[in-house]
Amino acid sequence: MSEEPTGPVPTLFAAIVRQLCVNATYNRDKVVLAPHVAYTKHGELYVDAIIVARNGMLPREEKLGSYKVTGLGEPRLTGRAFEISRLYEPEAERYAGSTLVAVEPAAVA
């Protein structure tokens, strides 16, 4: 029995909790995303993520984008870990009362 999640929502939630990138398609592009938070907006599920690569190319600059989960085709976990981006602001108003799961900074010993 596989321990990997199946379906878009469980896959994205696992990626956020484990801080692992996902491969997916978005607007016909093949993307590698580092999802930081899943939340609801107007009754729809969104993830905010950093694009690590688009169609095999590195982005010119780091950007935190919002992606409607229904628009992400076949998200799959990769073994690639990511660091929490400085662009992610967990206290941002758009996440207030709507966050379902978010990355957590590692505890400092």
Regions found by a protein language model. Give the residues of each.
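Core beta-strand-centered patch of the WYL/Sm-like small regulatory domain
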Residues: 2-109
